[in-house]
Amino acid sequence: VFVGLQNAYNDDLNAEMVGRENVIGAVVELSCEIFNPGFVQRNTVPSGTWFAVGELNGEITSRLKEVQKIMLNVGKCDLTDNIYGAKWTKLIANSMTCPFSSLNLKNWEAVKLPGMFDFSVGVGRESFKVGKALGYMIEPLFGLTNEDIGNAGEDAAELVMKKMVKDVGPNARTHAAQDHIKGRRSEIEFINGRVSKEGRKLGISTPYNDAVVEIAKMTHSGKIDLDPSNINILFKKLEELIRD
């Protein structure tokens, strides 16, 4: 059995490699870092760690329950019959922290920069809109309930953002930021880029996500260095995209 713990929306790609019948999808709420071989720094305590696992066909199987037992040693773990909806919900959450990746800051530091929280919420609203248009049923992740999400309405992205920043811990650094620090290609093209790609197919404008992808490309190519001042480049890129 292959349990994909990646952030991006890629269970179908995993299925192409190892066979659909061998794949179990998973969603993760946990911050950790690996900068030295064999040493994992965990930034989220067990009480704030959450997983959801699900079969791609939506069935609740015995092997799924076995995986759940294993993951309960690490944190909370729920079973889901809506793994695609759950994965898109996590993609929404990840899309909102990806704007931090070029700032060389921890998540809590980045979100305090003037305008950054509102920008991230704008990213999330686009991601929610595209997911809804694709027909995905949004899952109440991170300990939230269906009622929480439903009552929030258009402010659901803001609710998820606040909950996520609170739970992951003060030392959390977004996954894409770690990739940039290591000089690796980040997952942003498969997260925000996925939102942009699906948005274009559906005729939905996604300037916030588009801006995040563009800044990530500039960072990876070396056109800009990791620095908090990149927030100004990000905001300027958004203005250009909206104007165009």
PLM features: residue spans?
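Active-site-proximal catalytic alpha-helix in oxidoreductases
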Residues: Y84-V130
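NAD(P)-dependent Rossmann-like dehydrogenase/reductase catalytic/cofactor-binding core
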Residues: V121-D244
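Short, contiguous strand/loop micro-motifs
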Residues: G54, P114-G115, K182-G183
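Rossmann-fold dinucleotide-binding core
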Residues: L5-M96, S101
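Short, basic, helix/turn surface patches
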Residues: F51-E55, L105-K112, I233-E240
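Beta-strand-loop-alpha-helix segment that lines the small-molecule cofactor/substrate pocket
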Residues: V1
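Short, solvent-exposed coil/turn linker segments
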Residues: G19, N82, T97-P99, K106-E109, ...
